[in-house]
Amino acid sequence: MFCYCCTLAPSCSLFYHSTSEEKIEDKNSKEDGSISFLVVGDWGRNGKFHQKDVADQMGLNADSTHCDFVISTGDNFYVKGVRSIRDRKWKKSFENIYTANSLHIPWFVCFGNHDYQGRINAQLKYERKSKRWKTNKRYYSFEKEIPNSMEKVLFIFLDTNPFDGTLIRRKHSDLSKQDTLAQKKWLIETLSSSTCKWKIVVGHHPLYTTGMRRGQMLDVRQSFLSVFEKYQVDAYFAGHDHDLQHQKPKGFTHYFVSGAGSEIRSVSHDSLQTKFAVSDHGFMNVELKKDALNLTVINYLGKELYKTTIIK
């Protein structure tokens, strides 16, 4: 059985449709029967555009929910990525912003188009300098065991940038050198060989969005939609659009956009597949149990804007 339900804050002004190459092995040590993590994207702006406020609320939330790790959906450093592991942006946009002890946990990141305007290798190498930056591949996967159960969760992080034809035409650094066929083959092999109950995929580009990127993601959607459906990916998290969304088109997969870690942009509300969409600074908290995924959207003031549960 696969179903979901959702709620949102009564005073929240937003749109809502009601409906009747490397695997990292890791075991979770929590005893409450859940894995919990935060999802934030499009954040690296020296603390501006409420980035620091979002970071502070992330710290409070991570502390109260005992978060295990943070997921970044990309565009980690504006406007042109970082140049080296000694780039000042590491301090100004990351180390001096996400300062709460509760955020000194693993950060699993993917890369966005703005990251590609710098040197991706600098972000891949930062793991050598930081204990919490846990990304040294452009795309990768790991499994986590759900405490007090025999079930596992598969997390897959994609590099969606080379699948975006508009970026290739703009000649973003390194993109033309990427082998999209190899990455897609790896994705299919990883999904098809998995025995995990839950499958979560993360990438920068959304497959579905009602934000400013609407209509621009057809290349990415055509590359991954059939794969997600065939192998029953439960949820796909993206950024790129600077807002917070839950899209549920026909099919198996739920699509979330968490790209509001700093600057935000407008989002439209005219699609029947849109379960939630808001232009507000914030992030998502996800609690994953054996039979349920509970997701909460929280803004930069700590207000819960939306909740949804996927039961499996």
For each of these PLM feature ranges, what is it?
Residues D68, D75, K197-K199, D234:
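Conserved acidic residues
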Residues E31, T274-K312:
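A short C-terminal boundary segment appended to hydrolase-like catalytic domains
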Residues G41-D42, G74-D75, L158, G203, ...:
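Active-site flanking residues adjacent to catalytic metal/cofactor-binding acidic residues
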